């Protein structure tokens, strides 16, 4: 088996030419014969570097509007022939096929064309045939051939050739092949998912190019990696790298804050809101949100849907927190936060988020649509003798937005666009209710005149009875229990309003 191989012949055919010139010049200096196609051939000629057209090698012109350029035995024979196999070498000599030691190729911008909203005919024309075939052939024969399928590898190969007198090692070629198969598999997955958008086949195929190694996973003894493009979603203005737990909380925070249009601040801990308020100014929203549970807010993730000015930053700066997220910041606010180097300050970018959720379990993956609907006053049906007031309806809507994003079983209390307290992640609904009452009392909230939202129906009337005795005047629940009538009758007996939405919002 061969080890070090000196590059004598190279085939170069790329869609994007940026970054290519230094490597091409080095290959020419080292006496490598270059073969190329179309625009790449002209690019090399413009550098005053000798290059042979692939058409001259094959004896065939580019045909079918450029669909067929490199698909020819004289090209693929030169790539796939095994240098150590006598029969291959005999055939190469018989048909006068030059051995190609290096293939530099990229792929048509299929994903970019889809994202740009191109027509189906434009998208189809960006399905690369020759390029993907060259990648697979060269990567398959890594024992004898170098494959570069990404401009990110140009400088790496250049350094190797300069240091090794124009040669590459087997280990280096195998590493390039691994990257090339990643490129080809990602490309094919993107094409499949485009075709699978309508009447999808029941298969799971996803590919993400970007990855970020995390400090650790959920706990220090666990390893963690984030697959995705964080830089597209956020601009980090300050702080250390995000941890696994930070990312989980940031995801929950973004999902929650996007429910609100008015100036709103939310504080989260372990994905659950411990403070939410909507007020005329973001400063007031911060102060009111913090008052919900200033104890749990310590070390939390904070998110706002308005610019953070210096006055608001000054108040936030009094609290120890892990992450702050906002659409923008006044420069003076950023400078204030940078006084503590580890605090993460993120500025949100305009990015469309996925509408799907995935979770690994057992030996597989489950997928579902994200819970993206929310029921407002128009979708609330009064089922009691007493109808909710306009303010109660407004607060019920506010509470419904929060309960949707809180771990089940959950109960949420709200008054005047402020979260008063919540019971979170309990194994029974009545326990969630009791927890919420205890928390409200701990922070001196009077529940009289407040409203309650439940993420699922009441199996028994006890929750309604306890809530009414605590001062709740209106209740929201999805309904759907075979004992709905018992809870409705209890609400009527206690003289409070109840609405149903018909939509459950479990969150696990």
Predicted regions mapped to residue ranges:
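Glycine-rich nucleotide/cofactor/substrate-binding loop typically near the N-terminus or early
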Residues: 39-109
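Glycine- and Gly-Pro-enriched alpha-helical subdomains that act as flexible
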Residues: 274-294, 418-464
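Active-site/ligand-binding-proximal alpha/beta "capping" segment
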Residues: 83-132, 136-138, 381, 387-390
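C-terminal binding/interaction regions
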Residues: 321-343, 465-508
């Amino acid at each position: 088996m061969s080890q070090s191989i000196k590059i004598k012949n190279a085939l170069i055919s790329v869609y994007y030419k940026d970054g290519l010139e230094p490597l091409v010049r080095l290959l020419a200096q080292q006496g490598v014969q270059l073969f190329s196609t179309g625009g790449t051939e002209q690019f090399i000629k413009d550098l005053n570097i000798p290059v042979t057209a692939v058409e001259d090698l094959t004896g065939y012109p580019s045909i079918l509007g450029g669909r067929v350029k490199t698909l020819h035995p004289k090209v693929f024979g030169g790539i796939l022939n095994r240098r150590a196999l006598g029969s291959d070498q005999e055939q190469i000599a018989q048909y006068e096929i030059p051995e190609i030691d290096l293939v530099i190729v990229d792929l048509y911008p299929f994903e970019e064309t889809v994202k740009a909203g191109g027509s189906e005919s434009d998208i189809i024309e960006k399905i690369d045939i020759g390029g993907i075939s060259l990648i697979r052939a060269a990567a398959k024969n890594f024992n004898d051939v170098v494959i570069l399928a990404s401009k990110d590898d140009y400088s790496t190969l250049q350094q190797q050739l300069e240091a090794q007198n124009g040669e590459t090692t087997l280990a280096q070629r195998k590493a390039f092949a691994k990257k090339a198969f990643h490129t080809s598999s990602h490309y094919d997955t993107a094409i499949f998912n485009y075709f699978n958008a309508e009447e999808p086949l029941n298969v799971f195929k996803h590919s993400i190019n970007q990855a970020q190694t995390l400090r650790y996973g959920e706990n220090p003894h666990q390893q963690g990696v984030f697959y995705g493009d964080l830089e597209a979603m956020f601009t980090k203005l300050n702080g250390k790298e995000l941890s696994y737990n930070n990312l989980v909380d940031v995801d929950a925070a973004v999902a929650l804050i996007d429910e609100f249009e008015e100036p709103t601040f939310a504080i989260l801990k372990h994905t659950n809101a411990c403070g939410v308020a909507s007020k005329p100014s973001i400063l007031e929203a911060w102060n009111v949100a913090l008052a919900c549970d200033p104890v749990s807010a310590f070390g939390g993730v904070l998110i706002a849907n308005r610019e953070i000015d210096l006055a608001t930053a000054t108040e936030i700066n009094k609290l120890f927190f892990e992450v702050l997220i906002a659409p923008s910041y006044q420069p003076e606010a950023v400078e204030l936060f940078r006084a503590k180097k580890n605090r993460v300050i993120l500025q949100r970018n305009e990015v469309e988020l996925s509408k799907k959720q995935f979770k690994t379990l057992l030996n597989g993956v489950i997928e579902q649509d994200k819970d993206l609907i929310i029921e407002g006053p128009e979708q609330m049906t009064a089922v009691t003798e007493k109808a909710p007031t306009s303010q109660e309806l407004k607060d019920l809507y506010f509470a419904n937005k929060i309960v949707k994003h809180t771990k089940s079983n959950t109960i949420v209390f709200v008054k005047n666009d402020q979260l008063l307290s919540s019971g979170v992640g309990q194994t029974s609904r009545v326990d969630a209710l009791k927890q919420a009452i205890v928390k409200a009392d701990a922070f001196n909230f009077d529940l009289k005149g407040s409203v309650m939202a439940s993420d699922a129906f009441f199996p028994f009337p006890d929750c309604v009875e306890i809530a009414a005795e605590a001062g709740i005047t209106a209740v929201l629940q999805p309904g759907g229990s075979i004992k709905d009538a018992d809870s409705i009758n209890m609400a009527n007996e206690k003289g409070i309003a109840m609405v149903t939405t018909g939509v459950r919002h479990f969150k696990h």
